[in-house]
Amino acid sequence: MNRARKRHVGWASLALLTAALAVAAAGCGSSGKKSAGKKSNLPTSIGKPEGTLNLIEWPGYALPQWRKPFERQTGCKVHLKDAGSSNQMVALMRTGGGGGGGQYDMVSASGDATLRLIYGHDVRPVNVDLIPGWKDFIPQLKSPAHNTVKGVHYGVSLQWGPNTLIYNTKKFPSAPTSWGVLYGRRYKGRITVPNNPIQIADAALYLSKTQPSLGITDPYELTKKQFDATIALLKRQKPLVKTYWNYASDEITAFANGDVWVGAGWPYQTLTLKSKKVPVAETIPKEGATGWADTWMLAKKAKHPNCAYLWMKWVSTPKVQAEQALGFGETPANTKACPFMNKMTAGSCHSYHADAPTAYFNSIKFWKTPVADCGNGKKNCVDYTAWQKAWTEVTG
């Protein structure tokens, strides 16, 4: 099932979670940070295709619509391994001693997994000069913090989406202007929130604007004091929430049935609900928003790097980006995808914010894995292990 419809935003099994986080924590020290940013023997050209490409993907990220033409053109036969969560992707990449174990060549990782893979030495740097479409990406996704460390690229961005505030227009005659509607008692029992530890960043972003004295400048880099304040807010929110949704379809059903009136979601849910004549709209409040972005990353032990580079080159082209965007309710990274999108579905470029102004993109704080290193030479930030534990306490 496709990513936007059925992608799980919550938890993998405890075994997968433990395996993923243990190595991630080990890779977040100074030596890991240094080596992650160290350039190493990047290829200057794409060699002869090896004939095979093994991908870990969000289900449907290599649909026949664009996979079959790639196979015919390159001779690279694509083999797929679907993953249902970021934790599962990390765990799969760490089979066989890590780095894909020689079994997997690439992974379509989201921002809450990419730094775990980089600092865990599971992926290798890539030469974006070999990916012509990269130069046409929106600036925010050319060298984002979630896949580029100290100027070294560990993959190429693919699709992205903002986390928007969705609301019932009959209950809200005008658009809410603040995320505060999700934290106030007025809509108790009518609120829906994603069931994902990275949701902590949304609360931190809200506090960065409403409680500036906390000094939050990056919602993914929180000191203990900032983190505790954020968790306290989420615990106060808990009694107000009708449902923590695991799948986009769960939130769609809740809005369609009238069970909820307002919540955090993606443009996919909004457009799907509108197609069903449900009175909803979406907005990005004054505090800004978080957002997810996926990256095709090259496994450190990839046996078919040439086919991998050809795949990155292929999926970065405007037409393929447009095909995937419309297939999943996502927004392409390539700015030249819009004409292809509109040709396929009139007005879709605007519907998915692909033609949004720079200010819109700048208002989005894209997911990245929380690590102990705050980037200031100190290791006083709360890492992802603690985020996961705290989220269990909030929602359990």
For the regions a language model picked out, list residue spans one by one.
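Conserved C-terminal helix/tail region of periplasmic/extracytoplasmic solute-binding proteins
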Residues: F361-G396
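Mature extracytoplasmic/periplasmic domains
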Residues: A299-K365
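Oxyanion-binding "anion nests"
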Residues: Y244-S275
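Extracytoplasmic ligand-binding site segments that recognize negatively charged/polar headgroups
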Residues: I56-P64, S86-Q88, Q103-Y104, S108-A256
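Extracytoplasmic/periplasmic substrate-recognition and gating elements
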Residues: G265, K274-G327, G396
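Paired acidic/hydrophobic, glycine-rich loop segments that form the ligand-binding mouth/hinge
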Residues: G102-S108, Y244, W261-W266, A281-E282
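Short, low-complexity disordered leader/linker segments with a strong preference
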Residues: M1-T52
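Early extracytoplasmic/lumenal segment of secretory-pathway proteins
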Residues: C28, G37-R116
